[in-house]
Amino acid sequence: MKFLERSLEVDHIHEPELEFAFGQKSAHPKDGLHLYGPHLKGKKAKEIRVGVIGTSEGIGHFRTWSRELQSIVKVPPPGKGEKANRLHLANFPGLEETFGISYDPDELSALSIPLADIDRATRVTNQHEAVDKVAKLYIERVNKHLHNEERAVDIWVLVLPEIVYERCRPNSKRTGLPTEKGDFAKKQKKRESLPLLAGIIDQSGETIFDDVPDFHRRIKADFLNIAPTQLIRETTLAPGAFLNTAGYPTRKTQDRATVAWNLGTGLYYKTQPRPPWRLSTIRPGVCYLGMVYKSLPNDPDGHACCAAQMFLNEGDGVVFRGANGPWKTGDYDYHLKAPAAKDLLKLVLDSYVDTHGEAPKELFIHGQTYFNDEEWAAFADAAPKGTNVVGVRIRPTGGEMKLFRDGDYPVLRGTALILDAQTAYIWTTGYVPQLDTYIGPETPNPLHVTVTRSKDAKPEIRDVLSDIMGLTKINYNSCNFNDGLPVTVRFARMVGDVLTMGSAIKGEKKQPFKFYI
């Protein structure tokens, strides 16, 4: 008997490098920022204008933490069972030393909200109403400041007491919590349908049911036309101030140096015109698009919103809002009709031309589902001659494929299993020699990548995998070596979450990505 045997090719995609000040390169954001500084480093420190909203205690914690950011924040000594040299951790050199920005902790635009008011709002019987009331406490304080104060703010930091995190998320368990009666019944989750009383009864207050009861999403939506925001929990800033009965912090947080790196990166990215680092390996004239779909909550017609995230070699992203419509075609499938697909891609291409003076040579559209014939024909038709539009499906896997190697650590990050000319598995997480560790709880799972469509010639699968590796390194919401997902896919759900909020309707058609994260 003869058995057909097929040998699969295993390859390794090199770690992409990032570019920092003076054109210097490094694979790790922390190394590059420490040694060279951000990509567009100024000759002198830039003063940023920071506003902070929270309880008086929360504002105090942020001021204390802000003073710590002015100098070195050291990695704590290794604990029991930890390596002496933990290369994935690094001391934070200080905000001005690292990023070339500064702010005076005593000159913050500080807006205080009594904890009792927040607590009372979180206990309103109807959860939609409770989240709305808590969000309004923060939003109205900012709007009052903007109306009365001349001092502009570059970024608003919202310091959240733990009760907001615990009680103001979807499906938050408030069992046993004494509740306060509000304007709506406890179980109401959508607008009342009263067609016979339309125009007689005022139902304007029921717009809260156009939103998901999620404080984070609501704040991001409401601030789209104000300024970028950074949400941070009091327990992150001062874990030692919140202890359990045994004398330990109530929640485990990252070490202080890592928190400093992440907070500093967020402050820089959200207040400066360009991100702190950019990819040095991206080919010129290439643009990446992440498709975003999300069902609209409580929409009577079952419509969904669509949007596109565009990322360039500069690293920064722009979100383009498309039309709402009947885009959902299955449990997890979304497809645009031809006019909407054409309009959305034209919006993206016009923006690219405005920035670069010419259309891109290649436009990669990343999605988690396949593209149907109608929408793909519209995408191809919207692109000018000379622009190759390429559709790439990127799907996380859950254990269907495992690859093992000898030794104590799993496969290297960047390992690729080539199935054919258009299909491969790529391990974007795994052992990183530079860090001498694998940061993860179990054997890493790969991404399944398929080049599904192409207007002109299909690109080499290794080029597609290399691009995906690079796009795992431009999450400016943290300062990690890499993420497991490319930024085009990783933040699709988060962007969709914000765009589907009824309070986001007034947002612009085109907005910087930094407003959404």
Swiss-Prot record:
InterPro entries: RNaseH-like_sf (IPR012337), RNaseH_sf (IPR036397). GO terms for molecular function: nucleic acid binding. Keywords: Plasmid. This is Uncharacterized protein y4cC. It comes from Sinorhizobium fredii (strain NBRC 101917 / NGR234).
